[in-house]
Structure formats: C-alpha cells, structure tokens
A protein has these predicted regions:
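Receiver (REC) domain active-site loop signature in two-component systems and cognate sites
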Residues: 60
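Conserved acidic carboxylate
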Residues: 13
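Charged docking surfaces used in two-component/phosphorelay signaling
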Residues: 20-28
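Helix N-cap/capping motif at the beta->alpha junctions
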Residues: 35-44, 65
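Active-site beta3 strand of CheY-like receiver
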Residues: 49-55
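Alpha4 helix (beta4-alpha4-beta5 surface) of REC/receiver domains from two-component response regulators
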Residues: 67, 90-107, 119-122
C-alpha cells in the first residue's frame, strides 16, 4: 500500500455518491483522492494542485466532461496529466471517440468492478512513470 501514498488522484464527477465510492475504493489501496463536484470545481482544483491522475465523468451539468478535457489539454500546467474517463456512456462509439480520437489514457463504463478501476489506474500510472525522463 505504501507506494501509492504520495499519488494524488482527482475525481471530477457530479454524483457525490460516486465520488465517495471511488474514494473509498482507492483510499483502501493507499491513494490520496480529492473529489470535485462538477467540471468547474474540478478545473479549479486541478489547476491549483495538479494531481498524478484525473478521473473524469463526461456528463455533468455545469461543464461537460469533453469540454473540460479540452481545457485541461490546452493548459501547459495540466496538459500532461493522464485522464481516465469514467462514464455511463457505454456505447462502443463513445469508447472509440475517447480512446482513439481524444486520446484519453483509458475509458471505463459505469457500472464497473472495483478491480477494473484499480487495474486501469495502476496501468496508467505505471505507463506515466516509465515515460518520464530520468
């Protein structure tokens, strides 16, 4: 559990129960999780305290997840932070758009198994660590 202690993950989601659930799952694995209720709050949080990873919902009332993603990638402070989409948009075309057009690091459809989330996060963070310059 120790290696994850310093890993900050921001989860941007408009459903408080989902934030609580994901926080519980990831805290048990040693990750530090900060939840942001909605896109605008998430954008502010990520710019003030850039995390190691962003978990992002797509369907939020205040700021659409794709709009937020574009803003993150256009900002020098946040453009290199990996993003995993967690959404109820489960159509194959949505997944293709996310992974191959937008180039998000991973795309998880709700509902998901806790192990699926953990494996995705570990894969993305390991890939990021391996691609960082020495």
């Amino acid at each position: 559990m120790e290696p994850n202690k310093s890993r900050l993950i921001v989860y941007i989601e408009d459903d408080t129960e989902m934030i609580d659930l994901v926080t519980l799952i990831l805290n048990r694995r040693g990750y530090l999780v900060k939840g942001a209720h909605g896109g605008r709050q998430g954008l502010d949080l990520v710019q003030k305290e850039p995390p190691d990873l962003i978990l992002l919902d797509l369907m939020m009332p205040d700021l659409d997840g794709w709009d937020l993603y574009q803003q993150l990638k256009a900002n020098d402070t946040t453009k290199d932070i990996p993003v995993i989409i967690i959404t109820a948009k489960a159509q194959a075309i949505d997944r293709v758009l996310g992974l191959h057009i937008a180039k998000v690091e991973d795309y998880i459809s709700k509902p998901f198994r806790p192990q699926e989330l953990i494996e995705s996060i570990e894969k993305v963070l390991t890939s990021k660590k391996n691609s960082e310059p020495l």
